[in-house]
Each structure stands twice: as structure tokens, then as C-alpha cells.
């Protein structure tokens, strides 16, 4: 059995295959997922697991160089937005690099998410709790 925090075999497989600039999406329970994109569905019930819990575990094994958010999260979900920014700041310190933040419209976010390696669906039931994580390199 793995000792690391990330135990989900599907997520672990996707993370291990990411190359520089490949992306992985962590979304709320309502984010549409195109049929052509790999879906990893973790949602058990409302808010289980939460968006922030999934971000925390995934980023424990993924090198992140950029994050893309829907600009609507700033006004429509400030608590999750602020908590996510705190997590990304802590991740910067742990990784020893800066993580670029980009904001796009929710419509553009949905378009870009369809180009990712996979979309992980959390049980989060709050608006715009979605992030596209862009892979960096560890060297």
C-alpha cells in the first residue's frame, strides 16, 4: 500500500503521466465534463469530499506551475477563493517556486477544462469551486 497521501489509483496514474504544461482539473459537483475527457468522479454526496480537500491531496504529489480559475469565484465564492489562494501560497513555499494565477470567464474555463488530461469531480456544492492545475517540472 502507498504511504503517500494520494491513494486513488486513477488520480495517481494521471499525475504520474503529466508532462510539463499538461493540465488537470479539480471541479465542483456541477462542472460539466465532456465525454472525450477522462472523468474521475469522487463525489459521494453534497460536499464530500470538498473541493479544497481534493486540491490538497492532489497537489501533495503534483508539481504545479500555474493555476487557472474562473473570475466569477472572486465575487460568488470568496471564502473558497481565499482558502484556495492560501493553499497555493503554501504549495509555492513547499515546492520552492512561484505559481502563476490566471483568471478567465467561466465559459472560457469550461472550454479550457475540456483540453485537460482529466477532470476530477469533487462533491463540492458551492459556485465556481474549480481550478485547472498546470504541471511544472521538479528540476
From Swiss-Prot:
<comment type="pathway">
    <text>Carbohydrate metabolism; D-ribose degradation; D-ribose 5-phosphate from beta-D-ribopyranose: step 1/2.</text>
</comment>
<feature type="binding site">
    <location>
        <position position="28"/>
    </location>
    <ligand>
        <name>substrate</name>
    </ligand>
</feature>
<dbReference type="GO" id="GO:0062193">
    <property type="term" value="F:D-ribose pyranase activity"/>
</dbReference>
<dbReference type="InterPro" id="IPR023064">
    <property type="entry name" value="D-ribose_pyranase"/>
</dbReference>
<comment type="function">
    <text>Catalyzes the interconversion of beta-pyran and beta-furan forms of D-ribose.</text>
</comment>
<dbReference type="GO" id="GO:0005829">
    <property type="term" value="C:cytosol"/>
</dbReference>
<dbReference type="GO" id="GO:0048029">
    <property type="term" value="F:monosaccharide binding"/>
</dbReference>
<keyword id="KW-0119">Carbohydrate metabolism</keyword>
<feature type="binding site">
    <location>
        <position position="106"/>
    </location>
    <ligand>
        <name>substrate</name>
    </ligand>
</feature>
<dbReference type="InterPro" id="IPR007721">
    <property type="entry name" value="RbsD_FucU"/>
</dbReference>
<keyword id="KW-0963">Cytoplasm</keyword>
<comment type="similarity">
    <text>Belongs to the RbsD / FucU family. RbsD subfamily.</text>
</comment>
<dbReference type="InterPro" id="IPR023750">
    <property type="entry name" value="RbsD-like_sf"/>
</dbReference>
<feature type="binding site">
    <location>
        <begin position="128"/>
        <end position="130"/>
    </location>
    <ligand>
        <name>substrate</name>
    </ligand>
</feature>
<keyword id="KW-0413">Isomerase</keyword>
<protein>
    <recommendedName>
        <fullName>D-ribose pyranase</fullName>
        <ecNumber>5.4.99.62</ecNumber>
    </recommendedName>
</protein>
<dbReference type="Pfam" id="PF05025">
    <property type="entry name" value="RbsD_FucU"/>
</dbReference>
<dbReference type="GO" id="GO:0016872">
    <property type="term" value="F:intramolecular lyase activity"/>
</dbReference>
<dbReference type="GO" id="GO:0019303">
    <property type="term" value="P:D-ribose catabolic process"/>
</dbReference>
<comment type="subunit">
    <text>Homodecamer.</text>
</comment>
<feature type="active site" description="Proton donor">
    <location>
        <position position="20"/>
    </location>
</feature>
Amino acid at each position: 500500500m502507498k504511504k503517500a497521501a494520494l491513494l486513488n489509483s486513477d488520480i495517481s496514474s494521471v499525475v504520474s503521466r503529466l508532462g510539463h504544461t499538461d493540465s488537470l482539473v479539480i471541479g465542483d459537483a456541477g462542472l460539466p465534463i465532456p465525454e472525450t475527457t477522462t472523468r474521475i468522479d469522487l463525489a459521494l454526496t453534497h460536499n464530500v469530499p470538498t473541493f479544497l480537500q481534493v486540491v490538497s491531496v492532489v497537489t501533495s504529489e503534483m508539481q504545479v506551475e500555474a493555476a487557472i480559475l474562473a473570475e466569477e469565484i472572486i465575487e460568488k465564492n470568496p471564502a473558497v477563493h481565499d482558502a484556495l489562494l492560501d493553499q497555493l501560497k503554501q504549495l509555492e513555499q513547499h515546492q520552492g517556486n512561484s505559481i502563476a494565477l490566471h483568471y478567465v470567464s467561466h465559459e472560457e474555463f469550461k472550454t479550457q477544462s475540456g483540453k485537460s488530461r482529466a477532470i476530477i469531480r469533487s462533491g463540492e456544492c458551492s459556485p465556481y469551486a474549480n481550478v485547472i492545475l498546470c504541471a511544472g517540472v521538479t528540476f
